[in-house]
Curated annotation (Swiss-Prot):
It catalyses: cob(II)yrinate + 2 L-glutamine + 2 ATP + 2 H2O = cob(II)yrinate a,c diamide + 2 L-glutamate + 2 ADP + 2 phosphate + 2 H(+). This is Cobyrinate a,c-diamide synthase. One of its GO terms (biological process) is cobalamin biosynthetic process. SUPFAM superfamilies: Class I glutamine amidotransferase-like, P-loop containing nucleoside triphosphate hydrolases. It comes from the Bacteria. Pathway: Cofactor biosynthesis; adenosylcobalamin biosynthesis; cob(II)yrinate a,c-diamide from sirohydrochlorin (anaerobic route): step 10/10. Its EC number is 6.3.5.11. The lineage of its organism: Bacteria, Bacillati, Bacillota, Bacilli, Bacillales. HAMAP family: CobB_CbiA. Keywords: ATP-binding, Cobalamin biosynthesis, Glutamine amidotransferase, Ligase, Magnesium, Nucleotide-binding. The gene is cbiA.
Length: 452
C-alpha cells in the first residue's frame, strides 16, 4: 500500500495548498488517489474529493479512540488506491494538550505507518529552514521525516539556498518547492477555508496548482518514498452491524448543509438503510423517510434562501410533530431553531426549538469535548460518554432545557465545562459533531426511535 502524509511545522504554512497540488498532479498522471484528512475538518475533505473524485476520509484519534479501528478504516479505504495521501492538521506534533501523541498528526503517521513529508514555509528564510527540519526530524525517535517541500519560494535562487542548507545540515531530502503565486491562494472565512460549493472557477485553480507542483516537485521521488512505509498489520475489531434494512434516512445535502463524515454515511448504508439526500435550499419538502439527519454547514450564508423556502421548513416541522426522529448537528441546530440573526437581519427558520441563532465576531467554541447526556436522548442514553468536536461562530439563545453536560480536558485536567444539546419529542440537536465509529451502538440507539 503506497502512502504519504503531508505535515507542516504549524498551521498557515501551506499544507493544504501543497496537498491539493500533489493530489491533482498525481491524478493527472493517471493514479487513483485516496485522500485522507487528520482531524475533524470537513472543508479540506470536500476539496480533496473535488480534485480526486474520491470521498476523503477523516482520521481522528480523539473522535475514534481506538487505534485498531483507525488502522482498519485506513486500510479499508486505501487498499484499492494507487496511493493514499493524508493531509495533516496544525503542526506535526500539535494535538490535545502537550502530549505529542494525543490526537496529533504524528500519532496518525505512526498508527498508519506512513512516511511524512514536511512542508516548510520558505517566506523570508534560508539556512534557518535547516534548523526547523533538523528539530522536527529529531523530536520523536519513532518518527522520521522522509522528505521536505518548501512553500512560498521567491525564486530559484531562494530555493537553492534553502535546499542547500537543509541537505547540508540534515539527512532529509528536499523534494522541491511551490513558488509564491497569489492565483493558487485559497480564500477563507470564519470556519476556515471557503467550501468548494461556493467557489467558482475551481478547476482553473486546481489545474494551475497541479502544474506548479508537477514542475517544481520531484514526483517520482515522492512516489518512491510512498513505497517505503512499513506494511500495516490490521487486527480489525469485531463489529456487530445492526440490520436496518428497509429504513429510509433523509439527509440534508446542499451548499448550506454538507458537513458529514464519509464513514458515518457508509456505516448507515452498511446496516441496510437507504440514504436519501435532499436540499433544504431547493426542494419543496423533505422526502418520505423514517429518520431525518441534518448535518452542519453554513446556514448563515444562505439564511435568506432557507427562510424563503417555507414549504420545506413546514415539511420538517410537520415531520417533527408527527414524532419522526430528527438528528441535527451544529448548522442543523441553527436551522431547527425559530430564527437566525445576522447583520441586523432576522430570518425565520424551522421552529422545532424556541431559540435564536446569533452570529458572533469571535469563535465561541472550538475543540474536542466529551458529552454526557443528563437523561435519555436520541443521541444516547443517560450517562453515555460521547466524544465530539465543536467549532462555531454563533450562539443559540434559548430557554429550552439543555440535555447534555460537555467537558473539555487537556493533559488530564478539566479546563472547561458547559451544557448544551436540546431534545423535544424525537428531535435532538446540538453544536456537537460526532463520529459513529467511536461507538457503533449510537446508530442502533438512534434508529431504535423509529416506529417500525
Amino acid at each position: 500500500m503506497n502512502k504519504i502524509l503531508i505535515a507542516a511545522a504549524s498551521s498557515g504554512t501551506g499544507k493544504t495548498t501543497i496537498t491539493l497540488g500533489i493530489m491533482h498532479a498525481l491524478k493527472k498522471r493517471g493514479l487513483r488517489v485516496q485522500p485522507f484528512k487528520v482531524g475533524p475538518d470537513y472543508i479540506d475533505t470536500n476539496y480533496h474529493q473535488a480534485i480526486t473524485g474520491v470521498a476523503s476520509i477523516n482520521l481522528d484519534s480523539f473522535l475514534i479512540d481506538d487505534d485498531a479501528m483507525l488502522a482498519t478504516l485506513f486500510q479499508k479505504h486505501g487498499e484499492s488506491a494507487d496511493i493514499s495521501v493524508i493531509e495533516g492538521v496544525m503542526g506535526l506534533f500539535d494535538g490535545l494538550g502537550i502530549d505529542r501523541d494525543n490526537s496529533s498528526t504524528s500519532f496518525i503517521a505512526k498508527c498508519t505507518k506512513t512516511p511524512v513529508i514536511l512542508v516548510v514555509d520558505g517566506k523570508a528564510i534560508s539556512t534557518s529552514a535547516a534548523a526547523i527540519v533538523d528539530g522536527f526530524n529529531r523530536f520523536d525517535p519513532e518518527l522520521t521525516i522522509a522528505g521536505v517541500i518548501i512553500n512560498r519560494v521567491a525564486s530559484e535562487n531562494h530555493f537553492s539556498l534553502i535546499k542547500g542548507a537543509i541537505e547540508r545540515y540534515t539527512d532529509v531530502p528536499v523534494l522541491g518547492y511551490l513558488p509564491k503565486n497569489a492565483a493558487v491562494a485559497l480564500p477563507e472565512r470564519h470556519l476556515g477555508l471557503v467550501p468548494k460549493e461556493e467557489m467558482t472557477e475551481l478547476e482553473t485553480k486546481w489545474e494551475l496548482l497541479g502544474d506548479l507542483i508537477a514542475e517544481h516537485v520531484d514526483l517520482d521521488r515522492l512516489l518512491a518514498i510512498s513505497k517505503t512505509g512499513a506494511k500495516l498489520t490490521v487486527h480489525p475489531p469485531e463489529i456487530q452491524v445492526p440490520d436496518f434494512s428497509g429504513v429510509r434516512v433523509a439527509y440534508a445535502l446542499d451548499a448550506a448543509f454538507h458537513f458529514y463524515y464519509q464513514d458515518n454515511l457508509d456505516f448507515i448504508r452498511s446496516t441496510g438503510a437507504t440514504l436519501i439526500p435532499f436540499s433544504p435550499l431547493e426542494e419543496r419538502e423533505v422526502p418520505d423517510a423514517d429518520f431525518i439527519y441534518i448535518g452542519g454547514g453554513f446556514p448563515e450564508v444562505f439564511a435568506e434562501q432557507l427562510a424563503k423556502n417555507k414549504s420545506m421548513r413546514e415539511s420538517i416541522l410537520a415531520a417533527h410533530e408527527q414524532g419522526k426522529p430528527i438528528y441535527a448537528e451544529c448548522g442543523g441546530l441553527m436551522y431547527l431553531g425559530s430564527s437566525l440573526e445576522m447583520e441586523a437581519e432576522s430570518y425565520e427558520m424551522v421552529g422545532v426549538f424556541d431559540g435564536v441563532s446569533k452570529m458572533t465576531t469571535r469563535l465561541r467554541k472550538f475543540g474536542y469535548c466529551i458529552a454526557e447526556p443528563l437523561e435519555d436522548t436520541l443521541l444516547g442514553k443517560k450517562g453515555t460518554a460521547i466524544r465530539g468536536h465543536e467549532f462555531h461562530h454563533s450562539v443559540f439563545e434559548t430557554t429550552e432545557p439543555t440535555r447534555m453536560k460537555l467537558t473539555k480536558k487537556r493533559d488530564g485536567k478539566i479546563v472547561k465545562e458547559w451544557h448544551g444539546g436540546y431534545q423535544k419529542g424525537n428531535t435532538f440537536a446540538s453544536y456537537l459533531h460526532i463520529h459513529f465509529y467511536q461507538n457503533l451502538l449510537i446508530i442502533t440507539h438512534m434508529f431504535g426511535a423509529i416506529e417500525r
